[in-house]
Structures are given as C-alpha cells and as structure tokens.
Amino acid sequence: MNKLILLTTLLFLSACAAMQSDDPDSLFFSIPKGSTLSLNKKLDIPHNETHAVIQYGKETTDNKRHDYDVNCRLNLKEFGPRTIEPENFKVTRTEDGQNWISQPSILRYYTEIYLTSDKGTDVIKMVCQEYGDQTDYHFTVEDIEVALGDYFSFTFPEKIDSGK
C-alpha cells in the first residue's frame, strides 16, 4: 500500500513538472525573472491615482474597463497627474493566481508582474486580470500582450529560467 501511495505521489509530481513551457502563447508559460517590460510610449497617470489602466491597447479608467476581458494596470507609488516616459523595466518575479469575486460564480484570474526601474521611476508592479467562472482558465502572456497593444512589450531572456 505504501508503494502505491509513493508511486501515485511521484506520478502526480512529475505531471506537474511537465506543465512548464518556453512558449509565451502557452497556458503553462510563466514570465521569467530577468525579462524586460518596455513602456514604448508616454503613459498618463490620472489625477489622484497611483496607476494607469490599459485595455484593448488603449488607456482607460477603472470605471470604464471591461472586467471580463484582460486588462492591465501599472501600479506606482506616487499620485498623479503626471506622465511616465518610455523606459525599460526589469521583471523581478511574477505571480499567477485566482480569487473569488462573487462565490460561487465569478472568479478573478490575475498575473502580478513585479518590476524595477533603472531610471528611478517609482514603479511597483503591473497587474493583469480578467473575470471568469470556474470553467474558464487563466489567460496567456499573448493575451496580456494583446491587452497592452503598443504601449508595452516584453523581451524574454534567451535561456528561460524555471524559477519565477
């Protein structure tokens, strides 16, 4: 009986390990540490806000975003109004997850991309999210890129590190 439990556990763990991918279009791809997130054009931070929201490749607001499609917000420490100039941010880690918005019907799927700036910009992270239900799945990096349009782009390291 113990051998059966051990074998089952090993099979389960090996199946999970195989769910890694180097393909950004895959559900199993995680943005690797050391990647670059480039802001390609000026981004406005609204008055009394510490973030900007991007969806469908355009700047929007929290009230105007469509929660059931992928949307991303760049979180900063200081309040606007102000403009963030184009620059490259380094990815220090990422976290994928989900939490209930209205149990048992609405889930929030999210990816948090923690960032640093060599220019001293007070960036904290980019959070991309989408609402769905239990039958939905987490969005891909390609979905994030579509939501960001030409505002942001990713550059991934040549050798993908399996750590986040």
Regions found by a protein language model. Give the residues of each.
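N-terminal secretory signal peptides
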Residues: 18-85, 93
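Amphipathic beta-strand/beta-sheet edge segments enriched in Tyr/Trp
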Residues: 106-130
